[in-house]
């Protein structure tokens, strides 16, 4: 659905509404057309829909968890998975009239661009809310990356109104990426990315200390499979 015009100025680019536990089929994604360009729709829907939040939520609900778990959410896990799914989805993008090597490079370019944008936003959040940067100081920092004053003003206002929000996306992603690498290193040639995804989704939303313990247990189980 489209975000109503009256709310578009303050709404996020897109968001997924978690369905009630007694109405699991009510899965709705809202798109803010004033903030999402058509060429961003693929990654946006990957983050909010499949294999992002919508898939994550419905997968976990299919495990028949305690109803209490539906109230317990950790933003780092949730937005980390959404970002992980968004970046992973580029593995399935196709570009016209390019060879395999160029296609792989373009996919990586899209991932790197998303990560750079997210990392700069997260650093801006820290500089403003922790190091007390004012708008001019932030503009001086961001202009070295080609970001103009208009974009800086919007970002400055956002991180003031929503402190540490960006960090749940960036740190959440990097935590998941670290766990994936650790599992891959432990299992070697027997590592399958689907096993990692399943292990993460089976645990559900939690802090990374718990998730790390559960991934370690699953890794030990998988290592004993001949």
Where are these regions (language model features)?
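Long, His/Glu/Asp-enriched segments that create or flank divalent metal/ion-associated functional microenvironments
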Residues: 1-226
